[in-house]
Amino acid sequence: MYLEHLSLTDFRSYAQVDLKLGPGVTVLVGSNGIGKTNLMEAIGYLATLSSHRVSTDAPLLRFGTERALIRAKLVRGEQSTVIELEINAGRANRGRINRSNPVRARDILGICQTVLFAPEDLALVKGDPSNRRRFLDELLVSLVPRHAATRSDYDRVLKQRNALLKSARTGKFTAGHEATLDVWDQHMARAGAELLHARLELVERLRPHLNSAYAQLTDASKDAGAVYRSTIQGVLDDDGGPTDHGTEPSPSVDDLRLLSVDELTERYVQAFAASRKKELERGISLVGPHRDELELVLGQAPAKGYASHGETWSMCLSLRLASYYVMLDDARTGGTAPILILILDDVFAELDVHRRRKLAAIVAGAEQVLVTAAVDADIPEELAGRRVTVVPGGIDGEG
């Protein structure tokens, strides 16, 4: 399956643009700031309903407009699927599948799958824990679209619970509020348990692929690992930082992976009770998946703060490759051909020659690879393919 046609209306800098694509490698070349990333961002948005560049939808709408439209035609063999996503200012986004009646935006999830490499990926290693939690949750949604509702439910309950805790901090907390908090504890425990259970399973699947990808990129100079730190095991301090380190999950975290959603729910209820006094004092929820950490490890040390610039890039690339391999595993297990689109957005300009060639050799065999670059010289010869020239406001030529 591959993306054959992309059409954008009032998305970012584009009033209207159409891009024809095919299987194999396509390289989009154009000067910086010309709009190449906008095209890749739109494709990624179809896959995850989120942007890798901004946290809200407002910047995605061309200035002065009230809505943007992304339309994509996907081809598998003799069959094609057209998906549309309407991004609206001030109201819910809507989707369409094969020009059907409008559906919820999240109903189009899982049709178009992407793995996007971008300069912003440095935040996966160097940034706050929220970047790594977002990486896990976006991958979860790509693999199992129903997890979009799982995360949405958790965020809704967390917002309500935090509002209640905040009212306590301002001196407005009553016995009635405490009973209400007990109810929200139950809701948040269940929603948190479902999200935690899914994340733990995903990390277990990612870990061997992460180490393998890092070895491919660096000739196995160090082992690469990932350790999930959960607040219900007390392995994080109150500010969200890890209190210990290691290349393998601690026994307590490993035990969590063996628990059912019901058992994790009970663990959360207990953790909320134990932390209630401190939460009431601070007016915020201190326990839950929203404060967990995915710690990335190189050798015996955490990658954040210890990895060199080159090692940091290798770890970022390895995380994306690991997600690609997990998606391939699912596609093959499901009895369908891989349906993944690999997007490398201005990545090669950030890498040394060795890493460029290693990465290019790994991804060159994918069914569809989209690459952006400011100049042809940034593209390794392993990714020689069709060239498209991007100019202000549109596409100039295709080769």
Curated annotation (Swiss-Prot):
One of its GO terms (cellular component) is cytoplasm. GO terms for molecular function: ATP binding; ATP hydrolysis activity; single-stranded DNA binding. ATP binds at residues 30-37. It is found in: Cytoplasm. Its main location: cytoplasm. Keywords: ATP-binding, Cytoplasm, DNA damage, DNA repair, DNA replication, DNA-binding, Nucleotide-binding, SOS response. GO terms for biological process: DNA replication; DNA synthesis involved in DNA repair; double-strand break repair; SOS response. It comes from the Bacteria. Belongs to the RecF family. The RecF protein is involved in DNA metabolism; it is required for DNA replication and normal SOS inducibility. RecF binds preferentially to single-stranded, linear DNA. It also seems to bind ATP. This is DNA replication and repair protein RecF.
